[in-house]
């Protein structure tokens, strides 16, 4: 099995200008999106060797809520990764992969446009990762292949929870 990089965009957050950007919180809808993403990944049997999140409040909370649907061992693998706070390039975001076994999985929880740009850098494919959405890239050699792209509505359906019409 090839190494996999999974990406989870934070759930819907408070509007810009309500507080400092790094302090913006998830809305109730964003919290539901994060829980649904975690539940869907658990239902699909996806487990992670490492879970890295942006230190910004909305991304940290997304990671925590998603992980709340996983085993205790999975929850203990969460940690902040400063490059995910924004403006990174693939080498910076993927530096932590050295800690992951050759066939392992890492989950990156962060922001746009960085996550979609990362998918593009790795695969050459343009994607639109929605708030609360998930993508996965299978890495092989110097590039990768887009393996999964799920919108929040699809994640809610997989998780078996009501959708918010997104």
Question: Where do the PLM segments sit?
Answer:
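Short, small-residue-enriched loops and turns at beta-alpha junctions
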Residues: 86-87, 155
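A structural signal for short coil/turn segments at secondary-structure junctions
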Residues: 45, 70, 100-101, 141
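Active-site-proximal alpha-helix that buttresses catalytic centers in soluble enzyme cores
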Residues: 2-82, 88, 95, 125-129, ...
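Non-DNA-binding regulatory cores of transcription-related proteins
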Residues: 99-133
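Short, flexible active-site-adjacent loop segments at beta-strand->alpha-helix junctions, enriched
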Residues: 11-12, 57, 84, 112-113, ...
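Conserved strand-to-helix beginnings and helix N-cap segments that scaffold or border functional pockets
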Residues: 90-91, 119
């Amino acid at each position: 099995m090839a190494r996999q990089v999974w990406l989870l965009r934070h759930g819907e957050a408070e509007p810009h200008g309500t507080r400092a950007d790094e302090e913006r919180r998830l809305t109730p809808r964003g919290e539901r999106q994060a829980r649904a993403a975690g539940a869907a990944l658990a239902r699909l049997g996806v487990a992670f060797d490492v879970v890295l999140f942006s230190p910004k409040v909305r991304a940290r909370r997304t990671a925590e809520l998603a992980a709340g649907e996983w085993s205790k061992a999975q929850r203990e693998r969460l940690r902040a990764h400063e490059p995910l706070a924004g403006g990174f390039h693939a080498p910076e975001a993927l530096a932590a992969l050295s800690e992951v076994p050759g066939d392992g999985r890492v989950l990156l929880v962060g922001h746009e446009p960085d996550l979609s740009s990362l998918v593009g850098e790795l695969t050459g494919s343009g994607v639109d990762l929605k708030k609360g959405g998930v993508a996965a890239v299978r890495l092989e050699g110097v590039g990768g292949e887009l393996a999964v792209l799920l919108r929040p509505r699809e994640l809610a359906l997989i998780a078996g929870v009501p959708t918010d019409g997104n």
